[in-house]
């Protein structure tokens, strides 16, 4: 490799440390990052495949602005998977609170929803099924997103009973492409930018 001085291979070098004065500076640095992140497909259709994303491709669907500030996200996905990374970046770039609920029990999840006033949950239908049966409503939750698996009207109805103030949608995505489109119930809309990719 042309840029590598062979005499410096395996030699310890100090890292250049960048100090940030504010979290806004950290977010700005992230948005300008040229770093790559390697993740693997689920293996649903065969052997898991390695997929390399840039920070830019992972954050392209992040929505920022005043209306996204002050949200409290339940972090219900594995942080090394596409959906986990997308939830992380959505929360991080808006300086939102992330509450880890991954692999917790139903009782622990409900306790954290109440304790932190969780406003947004993005998880698989299996995660939401694990919240059943329920004993009370949780009105702090404003938005529910399902992804990763097929769902049904019975589950939507149950979620609405648990989180009566929440809007519910279903996201369709892939590890290779990230979030593609979202549905409310059984009807989904394909964004204009990618409609020509579907028949």
What spans do the regions from the language model cover?
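Carrier-protein-dependent adenylate-forming modules in NRPS/ANL systems
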Residues: 1-26
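Conserved pre-ATP/AMP-binding loop-to-beta segment of ANL
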Residues: 17-40, 68-73
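Conserved AMP-binding A3 loop
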Residues: 36-63
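Conserved AMP-binding/adenylation subdomain of ANL enzymes
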Residues: 59-72, 80-120
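Conserved AMP-binding
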Residues: 76-81, 126
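Gly/Ser/Thr-rich phosphate-binding loop
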Residues: 120, 132-189
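Conserved beta-loop-beta connector loops within the AMP-binding
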Residues: 197-199
């Amino acid at each position: 490799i042309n840029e590598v001085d062979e005499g410096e291979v395996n030699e310890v070098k100090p890292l250049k440390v960048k100090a940030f004065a504010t979290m806004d500076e950290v977010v700005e640095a992230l948005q300008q990052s040229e770093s790559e992140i390697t993740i693997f497909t689920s293996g649903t259709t065969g052997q898991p495949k390695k997929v390399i994303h840039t920070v830019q491709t992972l954050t392209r669907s992040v929505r920022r602005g005043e209306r996204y500030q002050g949200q409290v996200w339940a972090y219900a996905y594995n942080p090394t998977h596409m959906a986990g990374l997308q939830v992380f970046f959505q929360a991080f770039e808006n300086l939102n609170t992330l509450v880890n609920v991954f692999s917790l029990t139903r009782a622990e999840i409900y306790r954290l929803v109440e304790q932190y006033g969780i406003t947004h949950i993005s998880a698989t239908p299996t995660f939401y099924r694990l919240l059943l049966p329920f004993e009370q409503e949780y009105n702090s939750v404003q938005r529910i997103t399902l992804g990763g698996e097929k769902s049904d009207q019975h589950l939507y109805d149950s979620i609405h009973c648990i989180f009566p103030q929440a809007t519910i949608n279903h996201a369709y995505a892939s590890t290779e492409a990230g979030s593609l489109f979202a549905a409310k119930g059984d009807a989904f809309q394909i964004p204009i930018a990618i409609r020509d990719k579907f028949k």
